[in-house]
């Protein structure tokens, strides 16, 4: 019975090449030969390549299947394989060459980038689920876990901002500030720099609330939209903000995207300052 060793060489984990090798082997009658798939991940130096070549030279039936994207390592691998007459398959090279010609753009040549993309996707999903779970101050336990905490009175776009930022992979919790309800104590215990207060002008808020009442089929004379009630809420909001000592963004005449960009700038600046 023939014994064939398929050597997987990759500058990342080697999962792609191994899956291709397994798919190919499964197409043959395993009674006629015995195959062994050996994975050599994280090929980063010419010494790593030499190790693969030495293993491959042990048997003329051995095959090297590689996914290497760093040009210098890939070229060295191809030269060593050719000079030793080792059968080999470049999984990614041919397609990357065609894509380069077709779209007239050079590839990143960065190992493991597909896993980074997967990680980014799952972080986004996690952030979206977080925003839903902790929307409208549902559970104070979310405060220490949040990357960003938004506070503001009603109609300051807390929920849409939370969702927008979640799609940017930030875990966001929002808490409504209402005079009749004390904010959770944990709000005053978190880092104030990750808390963003959303401020709105009295005139703008009055207009928004009256429009909201119309949509609900109610008269615009409800206390919810009166100047006295709005002033009361804004004063209470200012007191809470002063107690926390957090940054404030005026959302009166801003689109969601613009406010979100301001929030991300503040948060990222704080991260930069912390690392210095």
Swiss-Prot record:
EC number: 2.7.11.32, 2.7.4.27
Binding residues annotated for ADP, in chain numbering: 152-159
Protein's UniProt keywords contain Signal: no
Catalytic activity: N(tele)-phospho-L-histidyl/L-threonyl-[pyruvate, phosphate dikinase] + ADP = N(tele)-phospho-L-histidyl/O-phospho-L-threonyl-[pyruvate, phosphate dikinase] + AMP + H(+); N(tele)-phospho-L-histidyl/O-phospho-L-threonyl-[pyruvate, phosphate dikinase] + phosphate + H(+) = N(tele)-phospho-L-histidyl/L-threonyl-[pyruvate, phosphate dikinase] + diphosphate
EC supergroup of this enzyme: transferase
Keywords: Kinase, Nucleotide-binding, Serine/threonine-protein kinase, Transferase
Family annotation (InterPro entries): Kinase-pyrophosphorylase (IPR005177), PPDK_reg (IPR026565)
GO molecular function, one term: protein serine/threonine kinase activity
Pfam families (UniProt xref): Kinase-PPPase (PF03618)
Function: Bifunctional serine/threonine kinase and phosphorylase involved in the regulation of the pyruvate, phosphate dikinase (PPDK) by catalyzing its phosphorylation/dephosphorylation.
NCBIfam families assigned to the protein according to its UniProt record, in alphabetical order: PRK05339.1
Family: Belongs to the pyruvate, phosphate/water dikinase regulatory protein family. PDRP subfamily.
Official protein name in the record: Putative pyruvate, phosphate dikinase regulatory protein
Biological classification of the source: Bacteria, Bacillati, Bacillota, Bacilli, Bacillales
């Amino acid at each position: 019975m023939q014994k064939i060793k398929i050597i997987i060489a990759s500058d990342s984990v080697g999962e792609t090449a191994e899956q291709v090798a397994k798919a190919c082997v499964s197409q043959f009658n395993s009674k006629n030969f015995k195959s062994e798939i050996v994975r050599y991940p994280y090929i980063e130096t010419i010494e790593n390549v030499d190790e693969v070549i030495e293993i491959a030279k042990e048997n003329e039936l051995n095959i090297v299947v590689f996914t290497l994207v760093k040009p210098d390592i890939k070229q060295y691998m191809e030269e060593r394989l050719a000079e030793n007459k080792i059968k080999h398959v470049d999984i990614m090279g041919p397609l990357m060459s065609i894509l380069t010609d077709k779209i007239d753009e050079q590839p990143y040549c960065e190992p493991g980038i597909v896993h980074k993309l997967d990680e980014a996707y799952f972080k986004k999903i996690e952030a979206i689920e977080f925003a839903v779970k902790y929307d409208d101050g549902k559970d104070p336990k979310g405060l220490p876990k949040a990357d960003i905490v938004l506070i503001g009175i009603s109609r300051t776009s807390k929920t849409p901002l939370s969702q927008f930022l979640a799609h940017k992979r930030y875990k966001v919790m929002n808490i409504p500030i209402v005079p009749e309800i004390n904010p959770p104590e944990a709000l005053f215990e978190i880092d104030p720099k990750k808390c963003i207060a959303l401020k709105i002008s009295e005139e703008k808020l009055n207009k928004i609330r009256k429009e909201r009442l119309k949509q609900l089929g109610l008269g615009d004379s409800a206390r919810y939209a009166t100047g006295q009630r709005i002033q009361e809420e804004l004063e209470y909001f200012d007191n809470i903000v002063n107690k926390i000592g957090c940054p404030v963004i005026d959302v009166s005449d801003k689109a969601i995207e613009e406010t979100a960009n301001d929030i991300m700038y503040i948060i990222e600046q704080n991260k930069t300052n912390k690392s210095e």
